[in-house]
């Protein structure tokens, strides 16, 4: 098992240097040593970031750095890293998260022992200051259960992905599906017959950034996820042009009031979870029909 090369792919843009250092160090310090760490710099104007990455590369030959000439976004950057990967397996990492020391070792063992093709893991949600918020690890473990739960919500945290390279090659990487490229990938993987699951151990600290909580595109992301499920159920999930047209039509019909109400509900829910305030959490699902539907999908995806 220790001879299998594992490629870990990560994209960086404008994250604080301290976060990036902790992220990189958590990968370089893995108990499993036979890795290549492919880091894409998607901000060619960030000289401090470039200097930092080159220093790491000079000190550890397992690091491979790729520099984009212009900002091309997460999807294309990850595909660029995947195409560069030489490992039998590919793992994901985000530049603001922190992996458990035994993450790669445990995921490789779990994937092999359970005859799976792509897996995720549980996460500990932390604030920007690394204060613990909550643990999320009630994700479907077996492929049969996963195929049912994935139709309600994304049940594999993106930065915890670990899978066979052939999965990424078969799907030709990520597609340009705004706000939901990871959910699109998982649905296509299930549709094509790959076996997905999760190891229900906390193997990553997931940093919940304030900018993501107050994301103005939250409702667009939810509508996109709903359209992806519809495309899966109606057998056109692989037809990208048709899918994107359906998403565009749905989003164009949203009003500013609906988007603002959804955003407010999202903030209330986050405040309720952080402060263990059930009143705020309940209020969040009352003020927006879309957020109410999202919460119901989440509950169905767990139980």
Regions found by a protein language model. Name each.
Residues 102-134:
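Conserved donor NDP-sugar-binding/catalytic core segment of glycosyltransferases
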Residues 23, 68-85, 106:
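Glycine-rich, basic loop-to-helix element that forms the pyrophosphate-binding segment
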Residues 3-7, 28-39, 60-64:
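Short loop->beta transition adjacent to catalytic acidic/histidine clusters or analogous donor-positioning motifs
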Residues 11, 140-228:
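Conserved nucleotide-sugar donor-binding catalytic segment
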Residues 196, 202, 208-303:
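C-terminal subregions of glycosyltransferases and related glycan-biosynthesis enzymes
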Residues 15-29:
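Short, well-formed alpha-helical segments that are part of the catalytic scaffolds
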Residues 41-51, 70, 94:
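A conserved acidic beta->alpha catalytic loop
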Residues 90:
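Short aromatic/hydrophobic "clamp" motif used to bind/position activated sugar donors
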